[in-house]
């Protein structure tokens, strides 16, 4: 959340938040998740949007089916068209942050409501039930998500074992590949 607020502010816009969980984490990983009641998440979204109507929405970690359903209900109420879903589903340690019931709701309901979904490779693997080892696999996974109702998919390729980062953008009209040098950091 803090990084998103800083990014939006640096780009000259105003960020508003609706917290879905309090996480105990640092730059190396997530230790625990303290959930916010789904009804309070719904209220946060609707009340915040009554004050200043957002031009766009970015959705991050949705850790349970009840939370996802409350976000879907809020989206149905506020009717914003520019929605980015960054499906935070796996901690850096590899631990799943979301249960299977929630994954199914995300795959079958939520991705149809967003304009862009931005999974990394482990998240794309969970959403598509395939193993991703190459750029072709990333494109294949994006096409699976298209077939599930996603409109635009940006698969982040930083988890591939390579000296460069290769991301792919796919929609019904085009496939774009972005390749850059990988910057290795401690975190």
Q: Which residues fall in each region the model found?
A:
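Gly/Ser/Thr-rich beta-alpha loop segments that engage phosphate groups in nucleotides
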Residues: 1-2, 62, 96, 159-160
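Conserved N-terminal subdomain of the carbohydrate kinase-like
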Residues: 3-85, 89-92
